[in-house]
Amino acid sequence: MLASSRQPRHAFVEHHHQLSSSTLHRSGSPQTGTLRQDATTPTLATSVGPSMDRSASDYSQSGLPSPYPSNCGDNQSEAQSVTVDTSSAAQYNASAQQEVRSNNPGNYSASATPTSEYGVYPASARSSSFPDHLQQRSYHPASNHSGSSGDPSIAAPSPTYGAPAQYSPYGPPSQDMSHGYAHPGSNLYAQPRPDWSGYGQQHGAPLTPGHHVFPQTPTSAPPQARPNQVYSFVPIPGAQQHKRPRRRYEEIERMYKCGWQGCEKAYGTLNHLNAHVTMQSHGQKRTPEEFKEIRKEWKARKKEEEAARKADEERQRQAAQSQGGSTEGQAGSDVSQSSNGYAGARGAVQLPPIGYQAGQYPAATSTSVQQQPLPDYNASYMQGYQPASPYGGSNQAMYNQR
């Protein structure tokens, strides 16, 4: 039995291997049968000592299994622990495990993952009434600064991930905070965000990653002074005064005639005539010298027409002034009479000011409008007003006073 139980330690320590109580009952090996008999019979606990080197890792916790869930316990010890019913675990002797650990130190290979039975306090030092979850919480450090703990029950961080940062999660960040997340192959946050440009970098630390960093260009800053340039593609009415206005069809003075083989076409500009000549193949293009005499005649005729028009306008203006002089005299007399009549009528219909009181302003000298009943109406209204009986005889007397 001793020879068969001396097996390599690493064959029974696996992360994903979990034994159940059913496998303990169903296994036909003499070792597991002895273990089941040991768990149920306390008198044979000492005879199972040599066989416990195989199943020592199955009972990961050296004390009683706690009914409370562990807050800080690692998942490896939970995965390796065997779900033994409480009746058999309560009768298990804790000294047998301690004896197995002291007698068989060479069976634990260095490559095997350590279990959680290496606690800070030995099994004999803790009382049976001490809660196991409080004991497990005691040796878990609050913050792991070095990346590997002294307690073998806590697994070291995987080498594929970087070591944790060297600052407290609630303390002020260190100088390497500004480039702690910058990787050489990523340009995602190489340039600061535009919305955060006003705040600057943390603690004034410059960005020193392995890639290029572009200068910070805050968008919230006022734009640079630009020259007053107006980029308008819509023609401004006052900007193109040098161009002549387009004339209507009946207003065109057609002085440029074609004359090619009896062609009667005439145009208002030489450019339009040359377009006609080119399109219709009516000879060579015309030159301004050909129409020099025609233009002189046209200008002279234009001047005569302009002079005649101005003379006609002047004559009409003088006639209007002569007629306006006689009418202005009559209008002046009418205006004086109407102004006097308006003044008298205005005095008759003039209303008193807002703060009018009897005797403060002289009454208007007019018989058509009487302003005297206004204060009497106020006095009678205030005297005869009774809230209890608004339809009483006093109100009727007030209306009868008029």
Curated annotation (Swiss-Prot):
The lineage of its organism: Eukaryota, Fungi, Dikarya, Ascomycota, Pezizomycotina. Keywords: Coiled coil, Metal-binding, Nucleus, Transcription, Transcription regulation, Virulence, Zinc, Zinc-finger. GO terms for molecular function: zinc ion binding. Residues 1-247, 302-402 are annotated as: Disordered. It is found in: Nucleus. A zinc finger (C2H2-type) spans 256-282. Residues 19-49, 72-86, 99-116, 125-151, 322-341, 363-373, 392-402 have a biased composition (Polar residues). InterPro entries: CON7-like (IPR039327), Znf_C2H2_type (IPR013087). Residues 302-317 have a biased composition (Basic and acidic residues). Its main location: nucleus. Residues 289-323 form a coiled coil. It comes from Pyricularia oryzae (strain 70-15 / ATCC MYA-4617 / FGSC 8958). Transcription factor that plays a central role in appressorium formation and pathogenicity. Required for the expression of a large set of genes including factors that might play a role in membrane metabolism and ergosterol biosynthesis, the chitin-binding protein CBP1,as well as CHS7 that is essential for normal pathogenic development. Residues 87-98 have a biased composition (Low complexity). Disruption phenotype: Impairs appressorium formation and growth in plant hosts. GO terms for cellular component: nucleus. GO terms for biological process: regulation of DNA-templated transcription. This is C2H2 finger domain transcription factor CON7. Signal peptide: none annotated.
